[in-house]
């Protein structure tokens, strides 16, 4: 009797006995299979590099333009506030557009499209001859940033296998931090116009690399492009044996082939994950991260640290990069919730310290200098002026270890596939509208009430974030996107039975 070409393998099927792979062989095989996923992820997160670079562009530029002799470019307090905050307004518009583009063009093409407003915005700022050009360029780069913030985490989560999704999910934040650090470093060397010119480079490289990368298999399946989806998954896994994973994804997509109706949106399986993702992005901004990053040098000038504010900003950027690297390594080991707890606790301590310092420690007559006072000698005061730098480093470290990267990752993990494109855009819209309000009114609040008031407010939000994590956020470590989505069909608060 002729043997079938394919048959089910049983316990007695030993025609081709297998020798168990050694740990080293398994590690090399896994690295080989993940190499293409890493390449596709790197190509995508170059958009986050540009986002991080553009976000803090004002940090070295505002002090320079405040001293500008050109009346068309000189900034007063109100203009500086708008120059710093209009980026977030553009980012909110980018998040709004992502609600349409994410599902219309797909994740990859939406990321590539973001390069257009980004490149134009940098070019306008580089050649700015008036405040309106600075604001327009800043808003365009913000629009690109909001679009990438909604599209890149979704793309990365949909192409990554579960065992490395936590580490790869941290790369958007990692590259955003690296972009900010690059801006701080270049700000020590280049004038503000050339900083805008330098921002064009990562955008062009991103377009070039993404042209050769596949689209998300889940998106392709949702558009009934099954053959392309299988080819994309096979390329990403560097393996022809992807049919089991492909069938899992295909079954899940087919069950959710239609859009979410308003009636379904009121069901817990839909609104619970969306609400968790939106509130996480809302609380993330209320911790104070965006105004602190945008006005970092201004904060250091007002707290009179020992080192020049430009060097302080670069040091903080380096600490932020190191912290995100730690989060990327530990996220799949410690889990998401542990890092969120640690992150919120550290940010609370840092914000409270900054508020108490501003409230009770007297300032010198001029920034970055010391004077003799009755209660404190010169040496003691010099040591005290390290507190704002150390506390800011602690805040950035806490944020970058948890609430920075994990909110991006969880947004893409918990959102249901049928609503993922629209809901991720909604998350970014809420996030950046919140950031706009905070950034626009931060300097006004400081001038009216003092620098300590915003820091006390941020510390209270960090306590609220701890409570929210414990009550509402599920642990998604090691779960496939299909398992996470199935979990929200239950009414349990944890994966544990």
UniProtKB/Swiss-Prot annotation:
Probable sugar transporter that acts as a regulator of glycolysis in macrophages. Does not transport glucose. Residues 1-36, 102-115, 160-171, 215-273, 334-337, 407-425, 469-497 are cytoplasmic. It is found in: Lysosome membrane. Residues 58-80, 137-138, 193, 295-312, 359-385, 447 are extracellular. One of its GO terms (biological process) is regulation of glycolytic process. Keywords: Glycoprotein, Lysosome, Membrane, Sugar transport, Transmembrane, Transmembrane helix, Transport. GO terms for molecular function: transmembrane transporter activity. The keyword Glycoprotein applies. It comes from the Eukaryota. It is a multi-pass membrane protein. Glycans are attached at residues 302, 368. The keyword Glycoprotein applies. It holds the Pfam family Sugar_tr. This is Solute carrier family 2, facilitated glucose transporter member 6. A D-hexose binds at residues 173, 284-285, 408. Belongs to the major facilitator superfamily. Sugar transporter (TC 2.A.1.1) family. Disruption phenotype: Mild metabolic effects. Mice grow normally and glucose metabolism in male or female mice is normal. Minimal metabolic effects are observed: female mice display a minor decrease in fat accumulation when fed Western diet and have a lower respiratory exchange ratio when fed chow diet. Mice also exhibit a subtle phenotype in response to lipopolysaccharide administration, characterized by slight changes in the metabolome associated with glycolysis. Disulfide bonds: none annotated. NCBIfam families: SP. The chain crosses the membrane at residues 37-57, 81-101, 116-136, 139-159, 172-192, 194-214, 274-294, 313-333, 338-358, 386-406, 426-446, 448-468. Mainly expressed in brain and spleen. Also expressed in lung, heart, muscle, liver, kidney, fat, whole blood, testes, ovaries and uterus. Its main location: membrane. A motif (Dileucine internalization motif) lies at residues 5-6. GO terms for cellular component: lysosomal membrane. Gene3D superfamilies: MFS general substrate transporter like domains (1.20.1250.20). Signal peptide: none annotated.
